Amino acid sequence: MEHKKTMLDYIADCPEFIRNNVADSAALTKPLVDEYVSGGYKNIWIVACGSSSNGSLCARQFIRRHLKCEVKIVTPFHFVSSENDFSETDMVVVVSQSGYSLNALDAIKVIEAKGRRCIGGPLP
């Protein structure tokens, strides 16, 4: 039987993932950087919950300081149900630890339904 990873497994894996992510940071962030630069965006929305939201809160100040733009963080539930009035000058980023959060996938569907491009893996 396959071992299903728990939060403790992810915590134990963190040092290696951090080293790899820092080493590959330019390649990992290139699609988002290219989209931001070419899109003429003025603000960023981050759609995230749980630990993804916590990480996004940490990134928020860094992004604001370096990009000189406003960063709004909203949960997938609120984004899908009511708070999705982003404009053409708002870049919307959905963050999910696993990539399979149903609420996050629903948020992506809202973004795509508004004719916006989504970057990342294909939806299951």
PLM features: residue spans?
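Cofactor-/ligand-binding subdomain signature composed of acidic, glycine-rich
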Residues: 1-39
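Glycine-rich phosphate-binding loops that contact phosphosugars or nucleotide phosphates
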Residues: 27-30, 37-124
